[in-house]
Amino acid sequence: MKMKKPTSSAQKPALAKPAKDFARVFAALKEILEPYEKHLHVLPYKPEFYCLVTRLAAHKGKPVWFAAIRMGKNYVSYHFMPVYMNPAMQKHIPPELKKRMQGKACFNFSEVDPALFRQLAHLTAAGFESYRVLKYI
């Protein structure tokens, strides 16, 4: 016969991890890109995905991606193509922001960080200007 373990009143139930507010992170990242909508085209897709591309078919008859935000299971990704297309831009990425990079052009965030988002906004402005120089915009 199996005996049940006695439960102690000192035992506490396991606490669930608080859910990350990825919707808030997504919205904050989207605010960085919204000023560029008037110069670019928003690709309609899904609520958890936001993408800006050039209006002109500038590369092999297709629009060029500028940036995209994707809400994932563990973080929100900010894909930023000017950094990929112009590797020299990577030299100007602050070390704190570079820690969030995955691959050549993706930054992952699990929470809103105003200081990092300001750095990302400056990088986005520089990337937009690089697209103007390349005549993508």
Tell where the protein language model's regions lie, with residue ranges.
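Charge-dense, helix-prone N-terminal extensions
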Residues: 1-137
